[in-house]
Each structure stands twice: as C-alpha cells, then as structure tokens.
C-alpha cells in the first residue's frame, strides 16, 4: 500500500492505470469518495476508465486507510493532558478541522505532492461537495468534473438536529464484531441501494464504516449537513466555471434526485443526468449505464 504525507497527515493512495505505448502521458482523473467510505468503491469505475485516464484514488483524511491526525498533533494532544503549557496547547490546536473546505485544500496539497498540475475530478456524495468546493477554489487545476449524488438542500432546524443526534449515535456505536455477524453488510447498505451490488462491495462498505476515525466521521456529519452548508452550496454551484456533469440516482434516499436537479439548474456549465432504477451508488448499481453517460459527457466536452 502506498502512503503520502499531505499537510502533515499520512494519506493512502493508489494508481489504477494501464501502461501506454504512446509517449504522451494520459490525463489524470482523481476519484473522491463519500462519508465513511474509501477509495475501494471507486476501483471498478476507475478500472473501466483506465484506457483513457491515469486514475488516482485516495482515502480522505480520517477515512479508510488514511490517518485522522498527524503524528505531531497526536503527540501534542497527549502532552496537553500532562501539561498546562500554553505552547503545547497551541501546538495541539493546530490540528486540521473537518470543514469540507479543508478537505478541498487537502486535495490540492495531494496534487502538489504528486506534481499533478491539472486533473479531471470524479467525486461522490460528501466527496462531491468537497469536489465542488475544489472546482471553485482551484478552477485552473481542473479539466472537467463529474459529481455523483450531489445537490442542494434547505435548512430545517428540527430535521438537522434529529439527523445529527442519530448520526452521532451511529458513529459512537461501531463495535468491530459487527463485521462478523452474517447479513449485517446487507442490512447496513440496504438504505443506500435500489439494486443489489456484489457481496465484496457490501463487505468493504461495512469495513470502511468501522474503520473511520471517530473525530473525522463525527466532525463531517456536522459540517456537511448544516445551516452553513445549506446556505453555501447553492452559491458554490452558481460559481462553477468548469464543465461539470451531475449524476443522480432515481431512488436515492440520501441525496434525492430532485436536489441534484435543483443544483444543476443553477448553472449552465452543469449538465444533469439521472440514472433510472438506482439509488445512492449508481456507478455500482448500474455500471454500464453510468459509464455510458460519463463517457458521453467526456466525449462531448472534449469535442
């Protein structure tokens, strides 16, 4: 497994690419996963696209195989417990936050470390929100973007409070023995799907959820679903200048298709498609249709 230090934190990454006999390098496509997931669920999509792209997959800070904190911050935090030194306390407080904009800056830093100047962005769910922020903060570094299962939503104080309470409970109750119980992977993923996906994918989702760093999982629940996010994301979609495809699943219960349609309607640079008979993972539930729409978009824009 390959790791790289990004802003002081060890990040897991991998390349899925096919050696080319042509000397000219292929364009890079970067895949960004969603909440409590990892790059693993992008592997099949990347493999399908590696004839045209060098595909870079990575685990977000605090998720999958990436660390949640830098070693320096962890040591500083432990030191604060044992000392009242203001200097040590200040060092501990330099820890990166779980604001989605911070994750967009993580992505920019990753590209810097790998000496990638420009790339295609292919992002999903919370990762698509991170991708949207990246498009607007680093537009000169993006060729085109594909945002899957993304959208805009209205703030509802009671609904958000209930979601945060439930989400906090889910994050706190994650015993490792859950992965050993038969059929738990089916129950865990059921809400996210309309069509079945391979058993290996189901198990990977559950494993990634159990692996997620507590602070990162909890922190991003509050930053991705919040009054601030509800107010910010419509403005971010309006600002997009990069050619973008927004893909929704028809029966997505997490980010309903109407939210995606509303987001795309805010900007002529954003093309919208809905994949029938899929939910929150259209790239896995109906890979042929998903890939067809993605390739059509890439071909049309390139043409």
Task: Give the ranges of each region predicted by the language model.
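Active-site glycine-rich loops that stabilize anionic/oxyanionic intermediates
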Residues: 26, 34-37, 125
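Short beta-strand/loop motif that positions the catalytic acidic residue
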Residues: 240, 246-248
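Conserved alpha/beta-hydrolase catalytic His-Asp/Glu region
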Residues: 157-161, 178-238
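Flexible "cap/lid" loop of the alpha/beta hydrolase fold
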Residues: 136, 143-176
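Acidic catalytic loop of the alpha/beta-hydrolase fold
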Residues: 251-255
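Active-site loop/oxyanion-hole signature of alpha/beta-hydrolase fold enzymes
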Residues: 9, 21, 44-47, 57-126, ...
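Catalytic histidine-centered segment of alpha/beta-hydrolase-like enzymes
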Residues: 278-291
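Serine-hydrolase catalytic-loop signature spanning alpha/beta hydrolases and amidase-signature enzymes
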Residues: 34-44, 55
């Amino acid at each position: 497994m390959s790791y790289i230090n990004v802003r002081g934190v060890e990040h897991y990454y991998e390349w899925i690419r096919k050696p080319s006999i042509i000397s000219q390098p292929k364009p890079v496509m970067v895949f960004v996963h969603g909440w409590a997931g990892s790059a693993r669920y992008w592997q099949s999509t990347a493999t399908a696209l590696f004839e045209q792209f060098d595909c870079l997959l990575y685990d977000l800070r605090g998720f999958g195989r990436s660390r949640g904190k830098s070693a320096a911050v962890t040591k500083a935090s432990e030191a604060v417990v044992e000392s009242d030194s203001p200097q040590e306390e200040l060092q501990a407080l330099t820890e990166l936050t779980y604001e989605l904009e911070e994750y967009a800056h993580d992505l920019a830093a990753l590209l810097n470390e790998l000496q990638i100047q420009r790339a295609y962005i292919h992002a999903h769910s919370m990762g698509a929100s991170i991708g949207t922020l990246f498009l607007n903060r680093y537009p000169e570094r993006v060729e085109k973007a594909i945002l899957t299962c993304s959208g805009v939503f209205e703030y509802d104080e009671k609904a958000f409070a209930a979601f945060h309470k439930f989400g906090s409970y889910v994050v706190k109750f994650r015993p490792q023995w859950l992965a050993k119980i038969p059929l738990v992977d089916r129950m865990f993923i059921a809400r996210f799907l309309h069509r079945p996906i391979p058993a290996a994918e189901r198990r990977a989702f559950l494993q990634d959820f159990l692996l997620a760093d507590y602070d990162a999982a909890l922190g991003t629940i509050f930053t991705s679903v919040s009054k601030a996010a509800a107010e910010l994301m419509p403005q971010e979609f309006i600002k997009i200048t990069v050619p973008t495809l927004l893909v929704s699943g028809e029966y997505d219960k997490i980010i309903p298709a109407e939210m995606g349609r509303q987001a795309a309607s805010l900007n002529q640079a954003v093309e919208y498609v809905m994949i029938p008979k899929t939910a929150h993972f259209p790239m896995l539930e109906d890979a042929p249709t998903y890939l067809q729409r993605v390739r059509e978009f890439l071909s049309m824009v390139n043409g």
